[in-house]
């Protein structure tokens, strides 16, 4: 079976990581896998040698915004699908889906698409276009039941819920070796790092030996630094950027924090749970955190945007080592249900059976 995966790029991000895991698994099982990037040639995730990777700068060829640009992009994608001639086409990002599915449908390819974020954030025009694309697909994959229920019954009937596979060979947390509260995310509004800083400022009195360490890059960096200074915690809020050893740092940290306003399923959250980092996460749409965190059993759930509850949850973990140890030991059990050997065969069945 020849499978074409179309994406913007393979730079750091949850969608990109999951697609790389799926691509490598399918190739290992003997399928021909072709990964086509159309926005940039940035590759941050390993692809197996028998995965064909190709960058075609479709998104950079046409500069002027408008319907003509969209038509030209879709026309070029149509040509690439015809050239590669796959049996099945897989798309995750909505911008990729609406641009590639019509061409794949016209060429009678098996189409599998996946909703990766809170579907309610889009306005009516985007929802209509997305639904047209989903109607053309053979199968639609959702990360959560809440996301699945958002769509009409005709979409639900041909859909399945498949959570994200874990990164392979994750280390285990041995013991807390520093006082870092770590986040791993892009610095953009969806992640609401502003709330994390405000919560940390409330947590800080009595916990002056702790730091909030935010790994990641993005357009909000300077305003986040300014907020930390305004709250008087600039010395204890640091932004190291992207690091290659984030999993090792998760094994050493005091706790992991995610304050997103909405998510599909946070990959860094799943990794933190699997490693055993005591975790505090917002119970945000579309329900990914609550799928895997039972409050005060294997982590802490807090309401979206609630800095007081977030500060209190951090304090509970910091002030009660026995509690922190208990939720850490419980959270690693997630490995039993989210290993690539459990998740990826479900993708293979959709694409290749």
Enumerate the predicted regions with their spans.
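Short His-centered aromatic/hydrophobic patch
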Residues: 91-97, 115
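Aromatic "clamp/platform" in nucleotide-sugar-dependent glycosyltransferases that forms part
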Residues: 242, 261
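Donor nucleotide-sugar binding/catalytic pocket of nucleotide-sugar-dependent glycosyltransferases
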Residues: 135-170
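N-terminal strand-loop element at the rim of the active site
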Residues: 5-68, 152
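Nucleotide-activated donor-binding/catalytic signature segment of Leloir-type glycosyltransferases, i.e.
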Residues: 225-241
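Conserved acidic donor-binding segment of nucleotide-sugar-dependent glycosyltransferases
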Residues: 294-296, 300-307, 315-321
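Short hydrophobic beta-strand element within catalytic cores of glycosyltransferases
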Residues: 278-283
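A conserved mid-protein helix/loop that constitutes part of the nucleotide-sugar donor-binding site
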Residues: 16-21, 179, 186-202, 219-226, ...
């Amino acid at each position: 079976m020849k499978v074409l995966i179309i994406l913007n790029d393979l730079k750091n991000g949850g969608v990109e990581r999951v697609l790389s895991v799926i691509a490598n698994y399918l190739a290992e099982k003997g399928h021909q896998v072709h990964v086509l990037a159309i926005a940039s040639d940035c590759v941050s995730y390993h692809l197996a040698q028998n995965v064909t990777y190709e960058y075609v700068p479709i998104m950079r060829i046409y500069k002027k915004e408008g319907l003509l640009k969209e038509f030209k992009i879709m026309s070029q994608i149509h040509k690439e699908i015809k050239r590669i001639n796959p049996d099945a086409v897989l798309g995750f990002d909505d911008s990729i889906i609406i641009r590639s599915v019509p061409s794949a449908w016209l060429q009678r390819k098996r189409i599998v698409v996946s909703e990766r974020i809170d579907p309610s954030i889009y306005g009516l025009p985007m929802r209509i276009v997305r639904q047209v694309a989903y109607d053309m697909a053979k199968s639609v994959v959702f990360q959560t039941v809440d996301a699945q229920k958002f769509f009409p019954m005709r979409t639900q009937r041909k859909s399945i819920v498949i959570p994200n596979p874990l990164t392979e060979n994750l280390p285990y947390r041995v013991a807390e070796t520093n006082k870092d509260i770590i986040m791993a995310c892009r610095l953009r509004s969806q992640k609401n790092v502003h709330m994390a800083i405000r919560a940390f400022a409330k947590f800080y009195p009595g916990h002056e030996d702790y730091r909030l360490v935010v790994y990641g890059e993005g357009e909000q960096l300077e305003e986040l630094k300014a907020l930390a200074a305004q709250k008087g915690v600039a010395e204890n809020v640091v932004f190291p950027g992207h690091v290659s050893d984030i999993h090792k740092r998760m094994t050493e940290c005091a706790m992991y924090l995610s304050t997103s306003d909405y998510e599909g399923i946070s990959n860094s959250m799943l990794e933190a749970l699997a490693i055993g980092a005591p975790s505090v996460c917002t119970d945000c749409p579309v329900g990914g955190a609550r799928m895997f965190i039972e409050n005060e059993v294997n982590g802490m759930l807090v309401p979206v945007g609630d800095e007081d509850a977030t500060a209190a949850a951090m304090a509970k973990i910091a002030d009660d080592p026995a509690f922190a140890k208990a939720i850490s030991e419980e959270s690693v059990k997630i490995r039993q249900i989210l290993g690539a050997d459990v998740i990826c065969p479900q993708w293979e069945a959709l694409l290749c059976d």
